[in-house]
Amino acid sequence: MKWGALLCIFGFLAFCSVLDRGLGWIPDIWQKCSSKNEEFQQCGSSCPETCANHKNPEPKSCAAVCFVGCVCKPGFIRDDLKGSICVKPEDCSK
């Protein structure tokens, strides 16, 4: 599936969430995450902490928009250099 189509689907799901429709109608298979350190959230951060930004002392602005999908579980951050998997901060790629 193309990235544009995925973004469209997630945008629609976020819109439904804003309307307070909930995601009960989404098939369970769409709510499964591929990594053991991820979990599905209806309203995750659109600017999650990653290995690239977790040591950055400068605050960044982030839109207050829900991200619908798989996010890293608490205590884990995304490492884009390892295939975008969720790792403990001390295990980030150098």
From Swiss-Prot:
Region Protease binding loop, residue ranges: 63-65
Tissues where this protein is expressed: Expressed by the venom gland.
SS bond partners: C33-C70, C43-C66, C47-C62, C51-C92, C72-C86
CDD domains: TIL (cd19941)
Chief place where the protein resides: secreted
One annotated Gene Ontology cellular component of this protein: extracellular region
Gene Ontology terms, MF aspect: serine-type endopeptidase inhibitor activity
Keyword ATP-binding: no
Signal peptide: 1-24
Subcellular location: Secreted
Entries under Gene3D superfamilies matching the protein: Laminin
Propiece residues: 25-30
UniProt cross-references to InterPro entries, sorted A to Z: Ser_inhib-like_sf, SerProtInhib-TIL_Domain, TIL_dom
Domain TIL: 33-92
Protein origin, superkingdom: Eukaryota
More about this protein: Negative results: does not inhibit trypsin.
Family: Belongs to the serine protease inhibitor-like (TIL domain-containing) family.
UniProt-recorded name of the protein: Venom peptide SjAPI
Native source organism of the sequence: Scorpiops jendeki
Source species taxonomy: Eukaryota, Metazoa, Ecdysozoa, Arthropoda, Chelicerata
